[in-house]
């Protein structure tokens, strides 16, 4: 199934990559790989992950404190947020 990033989710992802790049390029690459793996797992089995708010589901990234929040649309997956787990819960709700 194809996927689309909400523009604000794409910005969050880019900001996180930038942050990790400033720490170490290797860490940034590991983060990119972790998010790509998370999106792959979502695409393989989108209904596997629990709904956290109505039709919004969350899949946690491995080795990083981030979750990918998404909805399953008719013919694609909409990624609503690439959320750091210590960020204010629910900030992404207006994106649905």
Residue locations for each model-derived region?
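Basic/aromatic recognition patch in beta-strand/loop cores that engages polyanionic ligands
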Residues: 47-77
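Arg/Lys-rich, positively charged N-terminal/basic patches that mediate binding to nucleic acids
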Residues: 1-32
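Solvent-exposed interaction patches of small proteins and small membrane subunits
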Residues: 18, 28-30, 50, 55, ...
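Enriched for short, Lys/Arg-rich terminal
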Residues: 67, 71-96
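Short, conserved catalytic or interaction motifs in soluble domains
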Residues: 22, 47, 84
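Short proline/glycine- and basic residue-enriched helix-capping loop/turn segments at helix->loop/beta transitions
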Residues: 39-43
């Amino acid at each position: 199934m194809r996927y689309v990033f909400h523009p604000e989710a794409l910005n969050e992802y880019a900001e996180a990559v930038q942050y990790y790049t400033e720490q170490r390029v290797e860490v940034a690459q590991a983060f990119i790989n972790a998010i790509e793996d998370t999106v792959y797992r979502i695409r393989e089995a989108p209904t596997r992950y629990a709904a956290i708010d109505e039709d919004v589901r969350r899949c946690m990234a491995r080795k990083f404190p981030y979750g990918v929040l998404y909805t399953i649309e008719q013919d694609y997956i909409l990624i609503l947020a690439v959320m750091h787990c210590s960020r204010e819960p629910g900030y992404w709700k207006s994106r649905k």
